[in-house]
């Protein structure tokens, strides 16, 4: 469990540090362009979840994120699996959840600032922005979830049926 919490702590510290920098340098400045027409830093406060979707009050969001984080930690603890390939994706998701939970508890919403400007304009008469503004915690959650999907067979290998058949 030491590595699980170590990885998660790194995510939380990096997330909170970058959010403090965003508050300090971006909140009153607007947008800072890093790579023209592609990457910007834009301060935003998000009351919802992914893509700004709001579906519940902050109290319910805090309860939901806290419960999911607790379930992840308990699952990893009870699994007994201490392989890095197993711990890393769960610690990224856990750390990202805790990072955003800290924002909800202290600020009342999540601070976002990384903005990929893939396309902004009108489609069929409606203004659209094809990529949300996000943060380090969101990135960690997404990377952890992608690892679980893409590496599923390596993280959760099937039991060797040949070995089981020989035991009988």
From Swiss-Prot:
Location within or outside the cell: Cell inner membrane
**What is the membrane topology noted in the UniProt record heading this document?**
Multi-pass membrane protein
Q: Which reaction does it catalyse?
A: Release of signal peptides from bacterial membrane prolipoproteins. Hydrolyzes -Xaa-Yaa-Zaa-|-(S,diacylglyceryl)Cys-, in which Xaa is hydrophobic (preferably Leu), and Yaa (Ala or Ser) and Zaa (Gly or Ala) have small, neutral side chains
Enzyme Commission number, as recorded:
3.4.23.36
Give GO terms: molecular function aspect only: aspartic-type endopeptidase activity
One Pfam short name: Peptidase_A8
| Entry's Gene Ontology cellular component terms | plasma membrane
**Pathway it belongs to?**
Protein modification; lipoprotein biosynthesis (signal peptide cleavage)
Query: What biological process terms from GO does the record include?
Result: proteolysis
Q: Which InterPro entries match?
A: Peptidase_A8 (IPR001872)
Q: Which UniProt keywords apply?
A: Aspartyl protease, Cell inner membrane, Cell membrane, Hydrolase, Membrane, Protease, Transmembrane, Transmembrane helix
Task: Say which enzyme class the record assigns.
Answer: hydrolase
Active-site residues annotated for this sequence: 112, 138
TM region(s), chain numbering = 57-77, 85-105, 130-150
Recorded family membership? Belongs to the peptidase A8 family.
Q: Which HAMAP family match?
A: LspA (MF_00161)
PANTHER family the UniProt entry points to: LIPOPROTEIN SIGNAL PEPTIDASE
Described purpose of this protein according to its UniProt entry: This protein specifically catalyzes the removal of signal peptides from prolipoproteins.
Identify this protein by name.
Lipoprotein signal peptidase
In its UniProt entry, the species of origin is given as Chlorobium limicola (strain DSM 245 / NBRC 103803 / 6330)
Gene name, per UniProt, is lspA
């Amino acid at each position: 469990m030491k590595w699980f919490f170590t990885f998660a702590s790194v995510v939380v510290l990096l997330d909170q540090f970058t959010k403090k920098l965003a508050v300090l340098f971006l909140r009153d400045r607007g947008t800072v362009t890093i790579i023209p027409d592609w990457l910007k830093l834009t301060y935003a406060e998000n009351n919802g979840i992914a893509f700004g979707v709001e579906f519940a009050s902050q109290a319910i969001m805090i309860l939901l994120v806290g419960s999911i984080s607790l379930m992840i930690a308990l699952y990893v603890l009870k699994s007994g699996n201490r392989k890095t390939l197993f711990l890393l994706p769960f610690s990224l998701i856990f750390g990202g959840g805790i990072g955003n939970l800290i924002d909800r508890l202290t600020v009342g919403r999540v601070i976002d600032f990384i903005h990929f400007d893939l396309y902004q304009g009108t489609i069929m008469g409606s203004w659209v922005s094809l990529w949300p503004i996000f943060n380090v915690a969101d990135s960690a959650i997404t990377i952890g979830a992608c690892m679980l999907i893409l590496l599923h067979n390596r993280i959760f290998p099937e039991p060797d049926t040949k070995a089981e058949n020989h035991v009988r």
